[in-house]
């Protein structure tokens, strides 16, 4: 496509196989210099910007950018660098055509990486889906920059990366979604207490999931429920479309809330759907916002007005547990 540059399949395959033989050590200056040489790239001496090195790759997508660990991070790790980013696809095409082309290329590259690396350890999305293969020293990430840029391949220092991401979560500086095949110990984001802010955050998560999960061939479900499993719950299922459900099994005085669900936009249970529900035709911003409001309104109808009374369960169709600190409420996993 005019206005795009990309690695060939052979170039990408050769690079991925070389990566499996390269040692990054402790991610110090000597380690990075040696690793860049082993990749067949030429390191440009001197910083191209504050905290950045540059390596000429010989690819038409351009140089690789090597990022130092920011001094303000104050990490326990002694690594001096934490990320090397290379564009697999560099795209200047705007609009829907550009977005569709970047998505197609991302899926093609993902297929090659699955062949070479096997199943990923972590998947997620923030401005486009990303996939990670992790070992204790090196994490390899493929990221679709959906709205601009193209498709990037990032080589990440595992320990510094995870410390920096944990610090960001504790500050509340986080967005998007993450799904783990094996969930590690993870920090909680500062709690959200305002229902309006929570609804906006939930809407953002649903927008991200609706755009991302079809690209990585899965589906996602987010459940909001009381921590005592009182049968008061709502859920959103993202599977190429968007569906919300509200429990039909609430008990006692809370059953009075069922009388409000029709007015909130829910359809009554049927043979195929035992819960109150509504399906949206797409996962657009408007649909996600409406879905989030319907979920929160149903919780209120069930007598839940305090976010401290609910937790979230979230998972993909492939069995991965999703981690959504952006919601600002506890996960069900953290309560066990």
Where on the chain are the PLM-derived regions?
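Short helix/turn-capping signatures at newly exposed starts of structured segments
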Residues: 1-267, 271, 299, 304-336
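Short, intrinsically disordered low-complexity segments
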Residues: 267-289
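Residue-level preference for long, well-ordered alpha-helices that form the structural scaffold
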Residues: 98, 102, 284-291
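Alpha/propeptide regions of enzymes that mature by internal proteolysis
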Residues: 294-295
């Amino acid at each position: 496509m005019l206005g795009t540059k990309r690695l060939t399949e052979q170039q990408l395959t050769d690079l991925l196989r070389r990566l499996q033989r390269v040692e990054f050590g402790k991610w110090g200056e000597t380690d990075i210099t040696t690793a860049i040489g082993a990749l067949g790239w030429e390191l440009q001496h001197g910083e191209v910007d504050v905290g950045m090195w540059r390596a000429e790759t010989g690819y038409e997508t351009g140089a690789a950018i090597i990022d130092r660990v920011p001094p303000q991070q104050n990490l326990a790790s002694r690594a001096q660098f934490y990320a090397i980013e290379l564009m697999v696809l560099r795209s200047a095409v705007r609009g829907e055509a550009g977005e569709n082309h970047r998505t197609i290329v991302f899926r093609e590259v993902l297929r090659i990486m699955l062949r070479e690396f096997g199943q990923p350890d972590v998947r997620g999305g923030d401005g486009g889906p990303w996939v990670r293969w992790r070992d204790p020293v090196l994490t390899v990430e493929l990221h679709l920059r959906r709205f601009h840029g193209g498709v990037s391949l990032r080589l990440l220092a595992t320990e510094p990366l995870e410390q920096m991401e944990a610090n960001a979560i504790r500050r509340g500086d986080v967005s998007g979604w993450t799904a783990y095949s094996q969930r590690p110990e993870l920090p909680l984001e500062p709690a959200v207490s305002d229902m309006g802010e929570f609804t906006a955050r939930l809407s953002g998560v649903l927008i991200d999931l609706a755009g991302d999960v079809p690209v990585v061939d899965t589906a996602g479900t987010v459940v909001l429920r009381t921590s005592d499993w009182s049968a008061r719950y709502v859920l959103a299922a993202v599977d190429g479309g968007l569906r919300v459900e509200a429990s039909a099994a609430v008990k006692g005085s809370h059953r009075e809330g069922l009388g409000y669900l029709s007015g909130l936009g829910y359809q009554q249970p049927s043979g195929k759907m035992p819960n109150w529900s509504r399906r949206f035709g797409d996962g657009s911003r408007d649909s996600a916002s409406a879905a989030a409001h319907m979920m929160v309104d149903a919780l209120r109808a069930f007598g839940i007005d305090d976010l401290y009374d609910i937790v979230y369960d979230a998972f993909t169709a492939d069995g991965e547990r999703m981690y959504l600190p952006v919601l600002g409420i506890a996960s069900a996993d953290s309560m066990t």
